[in-house]
Amino acid sequence: MLARRDGGRVRLVSRRGLDWAWRFRMIVAAVEALAVRSCIIDGEVIACDSNGLADFQLLRWRLHHDPAILCAFDLLELDGHGLRDEPIEKRKAELAQLLDGCRHGLVLNCVFDDPGPVVFEHARALGCEGTRYAAGRTDNWLKVKNPGAPAMLRKPEEDWGG
């Protein structure tokens, strides 16, 4: 999901180009509160269970009820300046600075220094999915699915009740 702020307008744009701002008002309010004129933040909307773990099924029911949060992992544009050509470390540092003090609706995604298999084993033990991030749509995106995660066990649905 891209959180796009341009002046006073905030949109939450899905991969399919749909604006979900009306569904996630807490995220919109958090982006509106940022001390910038404009920005584009790349992230994933999540809802957490009572243990603080992302829960896909819970997110389905949060479509019309906050709290859902945007787990931010990249800053693509800031105050009209494109950052896509900057190193990911610089973009993440600017994103961390931008989100510093943000209390609700937006969180900075964790970065792990451990090797991928170690991180995946921790995610698997927690019942989480697990993805490796790369900016933009790419064939290099690697999503290793945990077959035991609740999101993998659910039945496919055509409509989320939007």
Language model feature labels by segment:
Residues M1-G162:
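Catalytic cores of nucleic-acid ligases and guanylyltransferases
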